[in-house]
Structures are given as C-alpha cells and as structure tokens.
Design a protein with these regions (language model features):
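P-loop NTP-binding/switch modules centered on Walker-like glycine-rich loops
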Residues: 1-71
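Charged, flexible cofactor/metal-binding loops and thiol motifs
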Residues: 42-149
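Unusually extended, aromatic-enriched hydrophobic runs near protein termini
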Residues: 18-23, 32, 139-142, 147-150
C-alpha cells in the first residue's frame, strides 16, 4: 500500500483504533475522540511521546499493554455520553486527570513543537513526562497525576 501511495503521489486516510498498524502506513497521525482531534503529530513523536490521555490508552493497547491501559485510564473512557451532556473536554468523563476546569473550559490546542499538537489542559506536562519516561516503560498514572497538580 505504501508503495502505491508513494508512486502515485496519493494521500491516504487510514482510519483505525490500531496505532501499531497506523505506524506502518503513515508519517502523521491525527487522534480523534468523539469527532474532535485531540492530538496530532508525526507518527514517531506521537507514539513515543503521547500528550493526551486518550492517545496514551490507544498506544498502550496497541503495544500489547491493554491491561495497563485499562488500569491506567479505567474502562469508563469507552462509556457513551449523550452529545448534549458533554463537558468542554469530551474526554473528561473518562479521564483520570480530569479536574473541574476540564468540565467548564474547552482545552486549547497546545503546540508541543515539531508539529505535535494536543488538546488537553495538561498536554505540556504529559508530553514532558512521556518524553522522560516513555510509553510502555513504567508509565505511572499516579505519578503523572502528581506532576499535573492533582
């Protein structure tokens, strides 16, 4: 597929929950949650240094650490919420880092550098933490909560 895309100069939209497979067919990834882009960036940077809790869950699930993703973020991230009941951050009801602000203020798109963006009030702190620790290398949500002022 990559050869065809390169040869013909095409753009490919590959929609999946499997970040691992997306890694092989894309140079840039956009992560959507309930119709909103919550994170985007180069494939390598986004996978290695995720800055949004939902992206972290997807990455942990795709590298065979789905148990850690469930333990880290909880199963509630996949529960349905009525459209008119959404807080300002659509991920807030399932996010272990959510604070009152997440329910009352829509997060801005944060520029993390090198074309990497995330919509989370704590994106900078999360990004710095994942750059230090690395996804799958002992990611500890309790420690991350402390680092973002919880």
């Amino acid at each position: 597929m990559n050869k065809i895309v390169r040869t013909l100069g095409l753009t490919l939209f590959y929609i999946t929950h499997d970040i691992a497979s997306a890694r092989y067919v894309s140079k840039k990834i956009y992560v959507l949650y309930r119709g909103t882009v919550v994170e985007s960036g180069s494939t390598d940077d986004l996978i290695r240094y995720s800055a949004h809790p939902y992206t972290i869950a997807l990455v942990l699930s795709s590298i065979g650490l789905s148990g850690l993703a469930s333990e880290t973020l909880g199963e509630k991230i996949f529960e349905a919420t009525e459209q008119d009941q959404y807080p300002k951050c659509k991920f807030a009801p399932g996010c272990p880092l959510a604070v009152d602000r997440c329910f009352t203020e829509e997060p801005e798109k944060i520029d993390l550098g090198v074309g990497h963006y995330a919509k989370c009030h704590f994106a900078g702190d999360i990004y710095n933490y994942t750059r230090k620790i690395g996804i799958g290398n002992g990611l500890n949500m309790a420690d991350l909560k402390l680092r973002v002022g919880r």
